[in-house]
């Protein structure tokens, strides 16, 4: 589809008063989406790194703090009413989000995907299977 088309789609959705929550991977994308009227800009740090199928390479949490702040600053440089959320990469657990949110300004929260639906299920399934595997028969 291409990012230009995504920006245009956000612009059209905004004209129809639809809620828009596009990802921005860098400052230029944040500026473009803010200009298009995005309600929420998700500062995306890449594929989630935790879990059984998580990405093997990503930014560190410390690097994510800097990048999320840069994206937030870029978005707010265009429109100060845009909501900015952090997401992805090493920001997978509540404590990860807390780490980023406590060290950034004008970042309003966390946008969950794998961290809300995949990771908790992986944990629960793994624990349940381990419990079944631990069953021992009396001899």
Where are these regions (language model features)?
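Active-site rim beta-loop-alpha module in soluble metabolic enzymes
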Residues: 24-65
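Alpha-helix-loop-beta-strand connector modules within alpha/beta enzyme cores
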Residues: 1-25, 56-84, 103-104, 130-139
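Short, well-ordered coil↔helix boundary/capping segments
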Residues: 58-65, 90-94, 119
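Catalytic cores of alpha/beta
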Residues: 26-37, 86-107
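Glycine-rich phosphate-binding active-site loops on the catalytic face of alpha/beta enzymes
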Residues: 40-57, 103-128
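C-terminal functional extensions of proteins
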Residues: 94-96, 109-116, 133-139
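Hydrophobic faces of well-ordered beta-strands that scaffold small-molecule active sites
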Residues: 20-22, 41-43, 82-88, 108-112
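Conserved, mostly hydrophobic/aromatic
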Residues: 33, 41, 71, 100, ...
